[in-house]
C-alpha cells in the first residue's frame, strides 16, 4: 500500500441550531463588513440568515446564478470592493458558493459558507467560471471557505425535485473519489459512509420531505462526499458534466444525476476495488444500475433530452470532452464516449 494523505478542509459547524454560531465565526475571522451573496430566489432567506449579524453586513448581492457567468462574477467583485467588504457570507447552493469562490480568488476575502443544498462546493478548493460558452475550472486554496455552517433546517424548504438531484450530485463526488489516482484509505472510508448515508436520506426525504433527521443525514452525507472530491483529482464524470453545463447551460445537479450511472458504467471494469466499495455502500450488485434506479424511483431525471439537450449536440459535447486529456481509469475512446452520451441523452439504462 502506497499513498500520500494531505487532507484540506474548512472548519465545520454541523447540526440543528448551528446557525447560532454565525456571529462567533465572523468574529473569529475578523469579519465586520460582510458581503452577503445569494441567488435571486434565496434573497429573502439570505436576509433572514444575516439578520442576527446585520450590523456587520456591508452589502447584499443576490445575482448568483448557475455556472458563475463571468459578468456576474465581475459585478459581485465590484460590489465587494466598493462596499469595502472584508469577508463574504455565501448562503445557498453551488451557484452562490461558486460565486463566492471567484470573489475570494480575486479579492482574497475569507468566506463563511451556509449551504442550503447538498452540492458540496463549500468543502473544496475547486472553482469554476463560464465565459463565451466555456466553463473553466481550477483549484486554489484561497477559494476554500474558512468556515462552513451546516444547518439542516435551512434545507427543509428545498423543493423535493432539487433535493434528490442535489443529493445524487453529492454521491457523484464520492464515486469519482473512489477511483482517483490520489485516493487514500481514509478518503475511501469517507466515500463509502457518505454514499450510504446519502442514499438512505434520499428515500426518506422522498417519502417525507420535511423529515429533519433525513435532511440532516443528507447534509452529513454531502459533507463527507464533498470532502472526498475536494482532496482528489476528478475524472470522466465531472469532465462531462462541466462540459454539458458550460456549453449547453444544462442545470448542474440534474446533469450530474443523469450522467453518473453512465460514467460509472464506462469505467466499471477498470476499477474493481471501487466497485466492491460501491456494492456495499449502495446495497446492490450492479452499482451503475443502482444509481440509475435511485434517480428514476425518486422522481429525478434520467435523460439529458429532458434537461434541454438536443441530439445534434452529442458529437460536439463528446469532442469537447476529449480536447483536454485528464486522468481516467479507462482510456477515453470517442466512439465509446458518444455511445455513453447517446444512452444518457435517451435515458436508457447504463451499459458498459
Swiss-Prot record:
Its EC number is 1.3.1.32. Coiled coil: none annotated. Keywords: Aromatic hydrocarbons catabolism, NAD, Oxidoreductase. One of its GO terms (biological process) is catabolic process. GO terms for molecular function: alcohol dehydrogenase (NAD+) activity; maleylacetate reductase activity; metal ion binding. Pfam families: ADH_Fe_C, Fe-ADH. Transmembrane segments: none annotated. InterPro entries: ADH_Fe/GldA, ADH_Fe_C, Alcohol_dehydrogenase_Fe, MAR. It catalyses: 3-oxoadipate + NAD(+) = maleylacetate + NADH + H(+); 3-oxoadipate + NADP(+) = maleylacetate + NADPH + H(+). It comes from the Bacteria. Pathway: Aromatic compound metabolism; 3-chlorocatechol degradation. Belongs to the iron-containing alcohol dehydrogenase family. This is Maleylacetate reductase. It comes from Pseudomonas aeruginosa. The lineage of its organism: Bacteria, Pseudomonadati, Pseudomonadota, Gammaproteobacteria, Pseudomonadales.
